[in-house]
């Protein structure tokens, strides 16, 4: 009978299985990390009360064709729903867009830029590292734009990849697409069309391409970007724009 009792005792060590509940708590941060990896979202539980939504545009802007997995990309099908949600959410009063992109698909980049430009809420862009190629229209689409002192922006003509049909219509299509980019940039910034095209078709700046590599202060001098600054100035400016958009309170009204 004693042996029978000893056989029952080994079942007791199974009680320490309760600590297995701890990984469930650790699983919450993993969900946030997975969301950041997949969608590039910066929202974490501590920022739920913030009235400013931040969107990052990094790597290569992916178009209708999926890029290789080793490429770090920004997918327009992820960015556009975030912009729509920010526009509809009453708790979000401003939008901060941070760019460090090499460019990418022209139509996808213009789609994002048009969405940003047509938002009713205050928007501010900040170029860190680089805002090259089709990243330029996105950078100038906001109400106010900043660029880091060491950041650069490459301005070059539109290019095609893959099979190209050598007919006059192809070059006409390229010219029209390029005019869309030029028109958008000059409309939403202080740079003139002549100056922008001069930078775009410059032959002595880039080694293996036509165009110009514009550094922080030069981008402001040309009128492409509004101001040189970092995250502090960008947040301060966005807060000012939010306060200006808010309706004034009636005189004599008590505010807490």
From Swiss-Prot:
> Which UniProt keywords are present, listed alphabetically?
Cytoplasm, Hydrolase, Protease, Protein transport, Translocation, Transport
An annotated GO BP: proteolysis
Q: Where is this region: Disordered?
A: 1-29
Record keyword Protease present = yes
Supply the name of the protein. Answer: Translocation-enhancing protein TepA
What species is this protein from? Halalkalibacterium halodurans (strain ATCC BAA-125 / DSM 18197 / FERM 7344 / JCM 9153 / C-125) (Bacillus halodurans)
Annotated GO molecular function terms are:
peptidase activity
Give the UniProt family note. Answer: Belongs to the peptidase S14 family. TepA subfamily.
Cellular component (GO) terms are: cytoplasm
Primary role: This activity is required for efficient translocation of pre-proteins across the membrane.
Which cysteines are cross-linked by disulfides?
none
Catalytic residue list: 133, 156
Report any Pfam family annotated for this entry.
CLP_protease
Low complexity bias located where?
11-26
Q: What is its main location?
A: cytoplasm
Q: Tell me the InterPro entries matching this sequence.
A: ClpP/crotonase-like_dom_sf, ClpP/TepA
